[in-house]
Amino acid sequence: MVKRKGASSSEEGWNYEAKVAEIEGIITRIEAGELELEAVFEQFASAVEYLRQCESFLQQRQQQVDLLIETLSEE
């Protein structure tokens, strides 16, 4: 199995759906105006990091799918 890049994404228990839910929660709080300006910046930075982790995860899965499709084509 391929390891995920990034410190947070390689930890045990990392979950794509959970990160997407966290990103959605951050967006909701920012849009609702529930946060002070400093917290907005902190939450935005967290959301960007989660998005990077998710993108890396999806890229790795796409590579795995491409490899599987390639092996099917060879058979």
Curated annotation (Swiss-Prot):
What EC number(s) would the UniProt record show? 3.1.11.6
A GO CC term? cytoplasm
Gene Ontology MF: a single term: exodeoxyribonuclease VII activity
Q: What is its main location?
A: cytoplasm
Q: Where in the cell is it found?
A: Cytoplasm
Q: Does the keyword Thylakoid apply?
A: no
Gene3D superfamilies on file: Exonuclease VII, small subunit
Share an example GO biological-process annotation for this protein: DNA catabolic process
Listed under catalytic activity are: Exonucleolytic cleavage in either 5'- to 3'- or 3'- to 5'-direction to yield nucleoside 5'-phosphates
Hey, what's the signal peptide range on this chain? none
Keywords recorded for this protein, A-Z: Cytoplasm, Exonuclease, Hydrolase, Nuclease
Cytoplasm recorded as keyword: yes
The UniProt entry, under SUPFAM superfamilies, shows: XseB-like
Residues passing through the membrane, by range:
none
**What the protein does?**
Bidirectionally degrades single-stranded DNA into large acid-insoluble oligonucleotides, which are then degraded further into small acid-soluble oligonucleotides.
Under NCBIfam families, the record lists: xseB (TIGR01280)
Quaternary assembly: Heterooligomer composed of large and small subunits.
Family, according to the entry, reads as follows: Belongs to the XseB family.
Protein name, entry field: Exodeoxyribonuclease 7 small subunit
- Which organism is the protein's source? Nostoc punctiforme (strain ATCC 29133 / PCC 73102)
